[in-house]
Each structure stands twice: as structure tokens, then as C-alpha cells.
Swiss-Prot record:
Substrate binds at residues 57, 73-75. It holds the Pfam family Asp_decarbox. Is synthesized initially as an inactive proenzyme, which is activated by self-cleavage at a specific serine bond to produce a beta-subunit with a hydroxyl group at its C-terminus and an alpha-subunit with a pyruvoyl group at its N-terminus. It comes from Exiguobacterium sp. (strain ATCC BAA-1283 / AT1b). Belongs to the PanD family. The gene is panD. HAMAP family: PanD. GO terms for cellular component: cytosol. Binds 1 pyruvoyl group covalently per subunit. This is Aspartate 1-decarboxylase. Pathway: Cofactor biosynthesis; (R)-pantothenate biosynthesis; beta-alanine from L-aspartate: step 1/1. The keyword Cell membrane does not apply. The modification Pyruvic acid (Ser) is found at residue 25. Heterooctamer of four alpha and four beta subunits. GO terms for biological process: alanine biosynthetic process; pantothenate biosynthetic process.
Length: 127
């Protein structure tokens, strides 16, 4: 059986832009994408730590080193500049593959730079 597991997470990202009139998606600094293995057009879930909103969309590459986290289209109604968010991507694998799988988790600072890179989701950790 194939199951779905988290493979990448950008934790504590800060929204830098919200563009209502853009055609959907989220724009992410390509350096951040590379840090955790998220690819262009990949399906992601985004949660807003400020208001509890949770959406699904796809990724557009943003300028390297810019720190950009921009919610585009209708998502801009639920995310505002300065909101802290979590961006998660999932992969499908067998139960056997999942036994050795370790997701990449980048904990970001307020400038959307990688502060910590983890290879597991630690239970009961407050970051």
C-alpha cells in the first residue's frame, strides 16, 4: 500500500507579500525550496499561525536569497504580510520506505533565513 508522509517543511516562515490579483499559488525563495527539497509546481499545504487558516496550493520559484514568501490569488484573503506560516510538502511511499524516511524541516528566522535544518519532526518541541 502507498501512503502519504511529510517530506519537507518550512517552519516559522514569515509572509512577505500577499498578491490577490495574481493567478493562484505561493511564491517561495528558491534557496528555501532547495534547503528542504520542495520543487516548483509541487503541491503544498500552508497553515497560518495567526488565524488558523489552512490551504493547499502549488509552488512557484521565487528569487534566490530574497526570502520571499508570497501568497497569491484567493489565498491572499487568508494570509497577510507579517503572518507566520508553516509550509508542508508530502511524498508517497510504501510503509517499508517510510521506516527509513526522514523529512527535512527548516526552521526559519524572522528574515526567512534557515536558522536550523532538522531531519526529523521532534515530538513536543517548541521552536
Amino acid at each position: 500500500m502507498i501512503r502519504t508522509f511529510m517530506h519537507a517543511k518550512l517552519h516559522k516562515a514569515t509572509v512577505t507579500e500577499a498578491n490577490l490579483h495574481y493567478v493562484g499559488s505561493i511564491t517561495i525563495d528558491e534557496d528555501l525550496m532547495d534547503a528542504v527539497g520542495i520543487m516548483e509546481n509541487e503541491h503544498v499545504h500552508i497553515t497560518n499561525n495567526h488565524n488558523g487558516a489552512r490551504i493547499e496550493t502549488y509552488v512557484i520559484k521565487g528569487e534566490r536569497g530574497s526570502g520571499v514568501i508570497c501568497l497569491n490569488g484567493a489565498a491572499a484573503r487568508h494570509f497577510q504580510v507579517g503572518d507566520v506560516v508553516i509550509i508542508m510538502a508530502y511524498g508517497q511511499m510504501t510503509a517499508e520506505e517510510a521506516k527509513t524516511h526522514r523529512p527535512k524541516v527548516a526552521v526559519l528566522n524572522e528574515q526567512n533565513e534557515v536558522d536550523q535544518l532538522l531531519y526529523e519532526e521532534i515530538a513536543h518541541t517548541i521552536l
